[in-house]
């Protein structure tokens, strides 16, 4: 499959380690797509949970997926600043249907002042045991959690001061 073109829409599918679907974002506009990274945007898109419940996102968001990093980043544009929600996950895979990744439970919420909280450590411990995460996966995830925290401190990649604003402006070009 070729990479989606800028301006095209695609779904995002997250799975759990056991292969079960976790969550589907119905529509994301592609802003950049290369072998190394995909940047997309959405606003008020429908999200379907694994149990069939649905909800709609509240604000514009820029989504950043990397082929070599075991995390993805969602920058949410709110009235009081940019908030980030970071999923510790497998690198992305892409097919005709969607951008896909495995969600490994650990999350980092980053506030506009770049302080952060690591979330769902209990859920990670439970799923690590229940789904029998291999030791190698645990090591990879811990390493990439530390890499993510380094990116936050360094304001690297999607955490760079103008990154979200620049890509949001590009997104607005496609919504006119």
Curated annotation (Swiss-Prot):
Catalytic class of the enzyme: hydrolase
The reaction(s) catalysed by this protein are: a ribonucleoside 5'-triphosphate + H2O = a ribonucleoside 5'-diphosphate + phosphate + H(+); a ribonucleoside 5'-diphosphate + H2O = a ribonucleoside 5'-phosphate + phosphate + H(+)
Signal sequence coordinates = none
Q: What role is this protein assigned?
A: Has nucleoside phosphatase activity towards nucleoside triphosphates and nucleoside diphosphates.
NCBIfam families reported for this sequence: PRK13662.1
Record-level Gene Ontology MF annotations:
magnesium ion binding; nucleoside diphosphate phosphatase activity; ribonucleoside triphosphate phosphatase activity
**Which protein, by its recorded name, is this?**
Nucleoside triphosphate/diphosphate phosphatase
Homology family: Belongs to the Ntdp family.
* Cofactor(s) recorded in Swiss-Prot or TrEMBL: Mg(2+)
Q: What is its EC number?
A: 3.6.1.15, 3.6.1.6
A Pfam entry, by short name: DUF402
Q: Which keywords, in A-to-Z order, does the entry hold?
A: Hydrolase, Magnesium, Metal-binding
Binding-site residues for Mg(2+) 1, renumbered to this chain: 87, 103, 107
Report if keyword Magnesium is assigned. yes
Residues binding Mg(2+) 2, per UniProt: 105, 107, 120, 123
Q: Show the active-site residues.
A: 23 (proton donor)
Q: Could you tell me which species this protein originates from?
A: Bacillus licheniformis (strain ATCC 14580 / DSM 13 / JCM 2505 / CCUG 7422 / NBRC 12200 / NCIMB 9375 / NCTC 10341 / NRRL NRS-1264 / Gibson 46)
At the top level, the lineage of the source is Bacteria
């Amino acid at each position: 499959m070729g990479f989606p073109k800028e301006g095209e829409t695609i779904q995002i599918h997250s799975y759990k380690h056991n292969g079960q679907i976790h969550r589907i974002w119905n529509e994301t506009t592609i802003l950049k797509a290369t072998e190394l990274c995909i940047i997309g945007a959405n606003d008020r898109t429908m999200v379907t949970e694994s149990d069939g419940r649905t909800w709609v996102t509240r604000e514009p968001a820029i989504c950043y997926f990397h082929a070599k990093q075991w995390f993805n980043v969602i920058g949410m544009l709110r009235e009081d600043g940019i908030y980030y929600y970071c999923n510790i996950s497998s690198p992305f895979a892409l097919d005709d249907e969607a951008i896909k990744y495995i969600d490994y439970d650990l999350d980092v919420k980053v506030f506009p002042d770049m302080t952060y909280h690591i979330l769902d450590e209990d859920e990670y411990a439970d799923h690590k045991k229940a789904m029998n995460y291999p030791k190698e996966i645990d090591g990879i995830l811990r390493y990439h959690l530390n890499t993510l925290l380094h990116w936050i401190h360094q304001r690297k990649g999607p955490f760079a001061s103008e990154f979200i604003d620049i890509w949001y402006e590009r997104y607005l070009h496609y919504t006119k």
